[in-house]
Design a protein with these regions (language model features):
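N-terminal exported-region signature
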Residues: 30-218
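Extracellular calcium-associated, cysteine-rich motifs in secreted modular proteins
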Residues: 1-30
Length: 218
């Protein structure tokens, strides 16, 4: 009788477009990360594998001469036809970048999704400019569960911040969800590795519903 890709008689398994026997096509499928760029300073990160050279990553921008990008340790300037030049030559998935743009724009990056479990972010004592590697939103307490947090550790985005209040209270503040494409500043007292979980599409929603259904204290 007929056999599938697993060479079992009667099997109907077929290779998906990634050549995975019985796969669902998710292992090789490209994803696209659109990042809206505002006039002035923008904090962003990338969660996509591939050519990380600065001129490739930023190729979708309609950049203007003297537009500026910096990481925590280096920077580059846009020179027009010569492209982006400076000590910052490659963008990492683990870092946050600040981009100063003379015009509103859209940064669009495509490629294969990063696996957060194999992209640890080494946190140093003090301030760290961190990226966000998962493909979906993550509730802050789940997202930062891997680090050695201590009271008064602090995380901020351009629009909100949260403080760590200890094991029972966790992270609390206006910054309650971490989001793909966004970057953050994280201040920690103890160096450790930040390894984000692989969040599903609904993980942040489920967590919000759980919080809403908690009985109120009497």
């Amino acid at each position: 009788g007929p056999s599938g890709c697993d060479n079992t008689c009667g099997s109907t398994l077929e290779n998906d477009e990634c050549d995975i026997c019985g796969g669902d096509g998710s292992d090789c499928s490209d994803v696209t990360l659109p990042i809206p760029i505002a006039l002035g300073w923008n904090w962003f990160s990338i969660n996509i594998e591939g050519d990380r050279s600065i001129n490739n990553i930023l190729s979708s921008l309609n950049a203007t001469v003297d537009d500026f990008i910096k990481s925590q340790s280096s920077s580059a300037i846009y020179y027009g036809e010569e492209g982006w030049q400076g000590a910052l030559t490659e963008l990492s998935v683990t870092g946050m970048y600040m981009l100063k743009s003379a015009n509103p724009d859209n940064l669009v990056i495509s490629g294969s999704p990063v696996d957060p479990l194999v992209a640890p972010i080494a946190l140093s004592e003090g301030w760290n400019w961190i990226g966000y590697t998962p493909q979906n939103d993550g509730p802050i307490n789940d997202a930062l569960a891997s680090i050695t947090a201590t009271a008064n550790d602090f995380i901020k985005s351009p629009t909100g911040a949260s403080i760590y209040y200890g094991e029972e209270s966790g992270w609390q503040g206006a910054l309650s969800t971490l989001t793909p494409g966004e970057g953050y500043m994280l201040k920690v007292a103890i160096a450790s590795d930040l390894i984000y979980p692989n969040f599903g599409p609904d993980d942040a929603l489920v967590r919000i519903q759980e919080q809403n259904e908690l009985p109120s204290s009497i």
